[in-house]
């Protein structure tokens, strides 16, 4: 399924439950037919936000937004992108007690998906 179609389906499903919503903030990422990235974030009632750079979601959104604005730049290599994502996530979750003890980072390229786990503070 194309990421554009999946994000539209998910948006409609969330909007249908708007009076008794699922308390989620989904992020849909993938590659379009031409190989360009597709990024979409939604709120709990399915209002989509399409972007070309990055999407943040969750309880540490303000911290993540600031970190990503300062560290992200266009046309990063996959390893450089992973390192940037990791630094942003770890710095942000350290400042937010509700964010959990780590993260899983998925880097999607035309060659495949690379997934790595990060461990954060455990206190």
Residue ranges and their predicted role:
Residues 1-123:
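Long, low-complexity N-terminal extensions
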């Amino acid at each position: 399924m194309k990421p554009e179609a999946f994000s539209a389906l998910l948006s409609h499903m969330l909007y249908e439950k708007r009076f008794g919503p699922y308390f989620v903030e989904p992020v849909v990422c993938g590659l379009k037919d031409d190989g360009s990235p597709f990024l979409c974030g939604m709120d709990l009632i399915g209002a989509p936000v399409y972007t070309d750079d990055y999407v943040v979601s969750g309880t540490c959104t303000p911290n993540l937004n600031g970190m990503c604005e300062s560290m992200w730049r266009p046309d990063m290599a996959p390893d450089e992108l992973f390192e940037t994502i990791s630094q942003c996530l770890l710095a942000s979750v350290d400042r937010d007690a509700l964010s959990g003890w780590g993260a899983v980072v998925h880097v999607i390229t035309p060659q495949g998906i690379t997934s790595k786990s990060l461990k954060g503070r455990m206190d």
